[in-house]
Amino acid sequence: LILPVYNEKDTIEYFINQFLLFFNQTIDQIKYSYELIFINDGSTDQTAEILTQVFHQYEHINVLHFSRNFGKENALFAGLDNAIGDIIIPIDVDLQDPLHVISAMLNKYEEGYDVVLAKRVNRNKDSYLKKKSAELFYNFYNKIAEVKLEPNVGDFRLMDRKVVDEILNLQENQLFMKGLF
C-alpha cells in the first residue's frame, strides 16, 4: 500500500491497527504479503516521529520523508517508485476508503484486470462543502480536459506492477494520477 501523509499524526497508528485487523481477518482469502509505504510529505506536526517509531516497530513498514511539502501527487509517485510488490494500492490513512474494498479489488485482479478503480458510492460522511467542491471539480475538469475523469474516483485503486512500471517510465514531470486512467 502507498500511503501519502501530511500532518496525519492522529491517524497513522489507528490506520495501521485497522489494516492489521483487516489483514488478519482476511488472511485466508488474501494470498499476498504486504508492505506499507508511508510518504511523509513534509509534515509540520509529529508525523515524522510517529512514522520513525512505527518503522522500527513493524516489519512490513517503510517510510520516506520529504524535506518539505511537495504535494500529494509527488508523494504518490515516490511511493510507486519505492514499491517492490506486484500489486500496488494507493490509499489515504484517514480511512475514507474502506479497507474491505481491497478484497474486491484483489478479486478483480485475479480475474485478469491490471487496474481496478474504486468509486465512492456514498458520500454521506462528507460535508456539504466537500461534496460540492468535488462535484464542481469533476464538472469543470471534464469540460476542459480531453481525458475525462470518472466522478468520485480518487487515488484508491489497484495497479499491477507492469502498469506501475509504465507510469514510472513516462517522461512527464507533472503527472496527475487520476488523469492517467
Label each PLM-derived region with a short phrase.
Residues 88:
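Short aromatic/hydrophobic "clamp" motif used to bind/position activated sugar donors
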Residues 37-49, 95-96:
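A conserved acidic beta->alpha catalytic loop
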Residues 8-11, 43, 98:
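Donor nucleotide-sugar binding loop of glycosyltransferases
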Residues 27, 34-37, 48-82, 119:
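Conserved donor nucleotide-binding strand/loop of the catalytic core
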Residues 1-3, 12, 19, 34-39:
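Hydrophobic targeting segments
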Residues 66, 91-93:
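Catalytic metal- and UDP-sugar-binding loop of GT-A-like glycosyltransferases, i.e.
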Residues 64-68, 72-82, 99-180:
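Acceptor/aglycone-binding surface of glycosyltransferases and processive sugar-polymer synthases
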Residues 8-27:
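Short, well-formed alpha-helical segments that are part of the catalytic scaffolds
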